[in-house]
UniProtKB/Swiss-Prot annotation:
Localization of this protein: Secreted
Protein name: LWamide neuropeptides
Membrane-crossing segments per the record: none
Keyword Repeat: yes
């Protein structure tokens, strides 16, 4: 019985062992398959990773090469320019491959040199040349305004229409004729201009565009604000008629200033019968410079040999001049109440001055020498009339827009003392240099802060032009944050080796045949 039980247990044990072996085998097979699968997956992943890495390396290498290429071709950014990416109105190219002065790179601006070696020279716009410049096209050299519609002033861009002019079809305010048949200086050809001669109706001033009417003049038929006329010569000009040469005011009633239009009445003068404010006598019997003959005017030489010299009025000396009275020589304004500027007409009160004392001058009082504005309340500019307050200044208590401090404790040039104006030197030795406003620096100046030296526009938000107020942002620029403003030098230091290297690399190629 015991043996039988033992055999049963042995059989059960063998059976269990067999089952266990089968399971282990299956597990082993499964594990093996899993391991194979895992190994295969891992190998695939590794392979893909290696491929990705290789591609990444290749891409990085290509990108690095591309960056190196870009960097090598990138602008060194030396010199003056407008904007770096979108070239501004004027400057030097920030791209060593496009040197020279220009306006915009793609659409050249109003003035500059061509940024394209194939279009050198000065110009306005490349396709539509601007108001002034040289032709960017070697086939259209010279100075001009616009190429198709020449602008206000320039040389013809067309070799067939040389010279200086305003507009080609409708000549502008001033220039030379673009038509070789109509040389000379003029304003507009058909329409009356504010300044310049016209062909049909000559303007206020210019040369005749008609060889038959040479010379300088104002209007031909209608007197203008300034210039000579043919029939009724204006205030000043040369005769447009060869028979009446010279400078003059009006022909029949000589104007304020000019030369006689009559060869028998040469010289500079004001009016012929009643000499004007200033000029030479048109009468050989009354030579010299003067104002009025009987009642000498504001300034001039006496028309009377017995009353020589420069003066204003004889009895009541005017604003400035020399005394017409040998007993009262010198330059002055008024004798008793000195005018705005002059020398004392009184030997006891020599020197230059204005009023007792006026806006500017030297003291007429030997006890108060020097240049100044007003004695009690110094004006906008001058030297102190008080030896205790020497120097140039604006106002003593509230310094004006420009001057030197009248206070030895606040020397230097400045605008206003408490709130420095647009331009000046600091009136405070602790804030030296040139600047705009002290607290909020203006459009241009030197930093009043030793920690922010240099020229700049605004300190916090640099304006259109200046030097960096920060030692880390050297050079000339427009705006500090974008750094590449409308005009300036790179805020980065130049990258040329030396001046010769700079000249060599930034030289403007000369067009062939020039």
């Amino acid at each position: 019985m015991a043996l039988k039980c033992h055999l049963v247990l042995l059989a059960i044990t063998l059976l269990l062992a067999q089952c266990s072996g089968s399971v282990d085998k299956k597990d082993s097979t499964t594990n093996h398959l899993d391991e194979k699968k895992t190994d295969s997956t891992e190998a695939h992943i590794v392979q893909e990773t290696d491929a990705l890495k290789e591609n990444s390396y290749l891409g990085a290498e290509e990108e690095s090469k591309e960056e190196d290429k870009k960097r090598s071709a990138a602008p060194q950014q030396p010199g003056l320019w407008g904007k770096r990416q979108k070239i501004g109105l004027w400057g030097r190219s920030a791209d060593a491959g496009q040197p020279g002065l220009w306006g915009k790179r793609q659409s050249p601006g109003l003035w500059g040199r061509s940024a394209d070696a194939g279009q050198p020279g000065l110009w306005g716009k490349r396709q539509n040349p601007g108001l002034w410049g040289r032709s960017a096209d070697a086939g259209q050299p010279g100075l001009w305004g616009k190429r198709q519609n020449p602008g206000l002033w320039g040389r013809s861009a067309d070799a067939g229409q040389p010279g200086l002019w305003g507009k080609r079809q409708n000549p502008g305010l001033w220039g030379r004729s673009a038509d070789a048949r109509q040389p000379g200086l003029w304003g507009k050809r058909e329409i009356y201009a504010l300044w310049g001669g016209k062909r049909q109706n000559p303007g206020l001033w210019g040369r005749s565009a008609d060889p038959g009417q040479p010379g300088l003049w104002g209007k031909r038929e209608l007197v203008g604000l300034w210039g000579g006329k043919r029939q009724n010569p204006g205030l000043w000009g040369r005769s447009a008629e060869a028979g009446q040469p010279g400078l003059w005011g009006k022909r029949q009633k000589i104007g304020l200033w000019g030369r006689s239009a009559d060869p028998l009445q040469p010289g500079l003068w004001g009016k012929r019968q009643n000499p004007g404010l200033w000029g030479r006598s048109a009468d050989p019997q009354q030579p010299g410079l003067w104002g009025k003959r009987q009642n000498p005017g504001l300034w001039g030489r006496s028309a009377d040999p017995q009353q020589p010299g420069l003066w204003g009025k004889r009895q009541n000396p005017g604003l400035w001049g020399r005394s017409a009275d040998p007993q009262q020589p010198g330059l002055w304004g008024k004798r008793q109440n000195p005018g705005l500027w002059g020398r004392s007409a009184d030997p006891q009160q020599p020197g230059l001055w204005g009023k007792s004392p006026g806006l500017w001058g030297r003291s007429a009082d030997p006890q108060q020498p020097g240049l100044w504005g007003k004695r009690q309340n110094p004006g906008f500019w001058g030297r102190s009339a008080d030896p205790q307050q020497p120097g140039l200044w604006g106002k003593r208590q509230n310094p004006g827009l420009w001057g030197r401090s009248a206070d030895p404790q606040q020397p230097g040039l400045w605008g206003k003392r408490q709130n420095p104006g647009l331009w000046g030197r600091s009136a405070d030795p602790q804030q030296p240099g040139l600047w705009g406003k002290r607290q909020n620096p203006g459009l241009w100046g030197r930093s009043a802060d030793p920690q922010q030296p240099g020229l700049w526009g605004k300190r916090q938000n640099p304006g259109l032009w200046g030097r960096s107020a920060g030692s880390g942002q050297l050079g000339l620029w427009g705006k500090r944050q974008s750094r590449i403003g409308l005009w300036g030098r790179s805020a980065e230091p130049p990258q040329f080796e030396d001046l010769e290297d700079l000249k060599k690399k930034s030289a403007i190629p000369q067009p062939k045949g020039q």
